[in-house]
Amino acid sequence: MSTANKSPIDEFESLQSLMNDFSAKFDTALTQKRSAIINDKQLHYVKVNELKNQETQLQSDIEGLKQKEIKVKDTIKRTMEDLQMQQLKVDELARKQDSLLDEKDELQTEIDNLSSQVQTTTDSLEKSSNNLAEQLRKDYPELLKYEQHLGLKIEVIGQDSLKFVFSNIDPNDLDKEVWCELLVGGELFKVGDSFPPLAPDIITLLENEFNHHREFVKFLKTVRALLMDLI
């Protein structure tokens, strides 16, 4: 049955099915992003616990060295004849203690840096995910029209990558497809691979314009036109 002969109910059911498929695709993408964030946090917690265990061991070693130092000093007091040898041992223990204290400071600095890096990454992923979801909700009606009438397919190809595939672009070959990847894992959107390949200056222009206006429909129209010109 052609679109013109469909009843309003049939058209509604068809549109509803497309909307459900579209929502499922992006629910999957967002779920993968959340899973990546959770995995990063878990890895961070494991690393922090390992470093804390190392710190505890170093503190225990330091206390042990302090006890040894006390014993050495007592021996020096009791045996003056062995003063020089015992003093060398004390000096060596002091150097080891300083070295362990330095290692402790370095480990604490590493813990702080790791915490900061994980927090920055988490914030960036959450911000990107929220921005992407909000923009998709805003552009959803127009994206449905593209998917229904212009042969658009949107594929999730990674935890931070989407692939836009266009068909119905060549009247001589209706099955011919062109596509473009979009990286959405950072604060700014990045254009990935495409077919046919886009020139580097065109990719830079696309990224700058899209990150400025943040309108998916406008971006898709531009990409489709550029790829069609390369056929």
From Swiss-Prot:
UniProt-annotated location(s): Nucleus; Chromosome, Centromere, Kinetochore
Keywords of the record: Cell cycle, Cell division, Centromere, Chromosome, Coiled coil, Kinetochore, Mitosis, Nucleus
InterPro entries in the record: Spc25 (IPR045143), Spc25_C (IPR013255)
UniProt entry tagged with the keyword Coiled coil: yes
Gene Ontology CC annotation, any one: Ndc80 complex
CDD domains xrefs: RWD_Spc25 (cd23784)
Origin: domain of life: Eukaryota
Transmembrane segments: none
GO biological process: cell division; chromosome segregation
Disulfide bonds: none
Coiled coil residues, start to end: 45-130
Family from the record: Belongs to the SPC25 family.
Subunit structure: Component of the NDC80 complex, which consists of NDC80, NUF2, SPC24 and SPC25.
PANTHER family: KINETOCHORE PROTEIN SPC25 (PTHR14281:SF0), KINETOCHORE PROTEIN SPC25-RELATED (PTHR14281)
Biological role stated in the UniProt entry: Acts as a component of the essential kinetochore-associated NDC80 complex, which is required for chromosome segregation and spindle checkpoint activity.
Listed name of the protein: Probable kinetochore protein SPC25
Originating species: Debaryomyces hansenii (strain ATCC 36239 / CBS 767 / BCRC 21394 / JCM 1990 / NBRC 0083 / IGC 2968) (Yeast)
